[in-house]
């Protein structure tokens, strides 16, 4: 490993002289994620109750109106449509992943409820739900269930690196979280 070379006093003075009158460039391209709060240990009964409460919103009878053309996407009324575009482009990277492969519809609903509850509890605003291709049952039902939940702000078909058309990126409403503002 190379040793660091130190500049002589003369070189340092020359550098300061050349840099006089310059100003620091404002960083405007990378949006930093807000710091997540540390989560304390949660009792098992509370976790089960959160899961039941969150899955209460999912109904098989209600069919929300989703766009049938192109990739699967949804934006809750009152949420900026640009959020779905950011999901599509991969500007948000998911912090929690849920794999629904091999689950029944009832199990999948419970796991979705648990994921949303965990996201809100741990202040995670982007998650990835992998429903897979399979017999297209979960692939069709998952967006319908997510669109019914009041804490789901938006979702979009995941980019290739997160599963492509076999997965969804979901934006979850967290109380303190606001989308980062670009300057």
From Swiss-Prot:
GO BP annotations listed: rescue of stalled ribosome
Gene Ontology MF: a single term: rRNA binding
The keyword Lipid metabolism is assigned to this record: no
Enzyme nomenclature, EC number: 3.1.-.-
Binding partners and assembly: Associates with collided ribosomes, but not with correctly translating polysomes.
Name of the protein this chain belongs to: Ribosome rescue factor SmrB
HAMAP family in UniProt: SmrB (MF_01042)
Function of the molecule: Acts as a ribosome collision sensor. Detects stalled/collided disomes (pairs of ribosomes where the leading ribosome is stalled and a second ribosome has collided with it) and endonucleolytically cleaves mRNA at the 5' boundary of the stalled ribosome. Stalled/collided disomes form a new interface (primarily via the 30S subunits) that binds SmrB. Cleaved mRNA becomes available for tmRNA ligation, leading to ribosomal subunit dissociation and rescue of stalled ribosomes.
Coiled coil ranges: none
Family annotation (InterPro entries): Smr_dom, Smr_dom_sf, SmrB-like
Ranges for domain Smr: 98-173
NCBIfam families: PRK04946.1
Source superkingdom: Bacteria
Keywords: Endonuclease, Hydrolase, Nuclease, RNA-binding, rRNA-binding
RNA-binding is among the record's keywords: yes
EC class of the enzyme, as a word: hydrolase
Family note: Belongs to the SmrB family.
Gene3D superfamilies hit by this protein: 3.30.1370.110
């Amino acid at each position: 490993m190379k040793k660091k070379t130190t500049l002589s006093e003369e070189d340092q003075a020359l550098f300061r002289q050349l840099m006089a009158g310059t100003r620091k460039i404002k960083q405007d391209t990378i949006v930093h994620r807000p710091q997540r709060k540390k989560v304390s240990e949660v009792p098992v009964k509370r976790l089960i109750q959160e899961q039941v409460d969150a899955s209460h919103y999912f109904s098989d009878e209600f069919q929300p109106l989703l766009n049938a053309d192109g990739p699967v996407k949804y934006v809750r009324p009152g949420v900026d449509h640009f959020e779905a575009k950011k999901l599509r482009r991969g500007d948000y990277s998911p912090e929690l992943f849920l794999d629904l492969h091999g689950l029944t519809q009832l199990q999948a609903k419970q796991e979705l409820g648990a994921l949303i509850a965990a996201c809100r509890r741990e202040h995670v605003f982007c998650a990835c739900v992998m429903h897979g291709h399979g017999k297209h049952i979960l692939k069709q039902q998952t967006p319908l269930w997510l669109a019914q939940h009041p804490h789901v702000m938006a979702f979009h078909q995941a980019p290739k690196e997160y599963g492509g058309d076999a997965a969804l990126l979901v934006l979850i409403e967290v109380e303190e979280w606001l989308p980062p503002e670009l300057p």
